[in-house]
Amino acid sequence: MKKNLFILCMIMFIAQSCCEKPILIGHRGSLLGVENTEEAFINGAKHFGYQGLECDVKTTLDGQCVCWHDDHLQRAGIEEVLIPEITLDSLLSLPLTQTRKDVTYTATICTVDRYLEICKEYNVFPVVELKWATGINNNDMTLFPSLYSLIEKHGLVEEAVILTSMRKSLEYIRTNCPQLQCLYLRQTVKDEDVQWCHDWKTNISIQHANINPELVNTCNELGVEGAAWTVNNDSTYQRLVDCGCACVTTDYLEVK
């Protein structure tokens, strides 16, 4: 049986001991490269040594899944282009440029297929965040089977984690693809959110400032595991260790 990496990284979330170091997940790959592109993903795994890599998913005009946060490409210096209105071939021809920490990077769009190939090659688990996209949203999941097929193609069904703020999408996945692990993305958390996660056998991803020992206890009582996002400084990291959080998403954190 394949090793379930995500369960291993989450198992200490509710623990009270602060001796264990949290597992790190590279946010949109890492800081080193245009976000959500091949260079950022490879650097997240190879340079930083993150155990997981997170990407965002959008769909093109011809129904292909690509890694990007928005419908537009403005954060990469391209105006008046919308991913849902362009084919994959046309999208791949566009040069993406982004300056991060005073370093300018160039890249092309990364397909989800290539992202999963990188995860497999570097033995990291994928955290696939579903943004509202054509065919993958609360009202329409007709393109999700093609995304699932990519995960299956790379032999990552047991390792992959699906992350989204869209409840109905998660309910669809839990109903139709119960072998996939899911994370409910939240900024703030109410008891009702944790109860919903318990009912749907779904875990939770929480903005780091809203994680505290009381919330950890609430999750513990209902058997819900969680993750923290997005942590980029040592003091926040240490506070989460003290809270008992074992899994955090980061752009560039390096923990010795």
Model-derived segments and spans:
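Sec-dependent N-terminal signal peptides
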Residues: 4-14
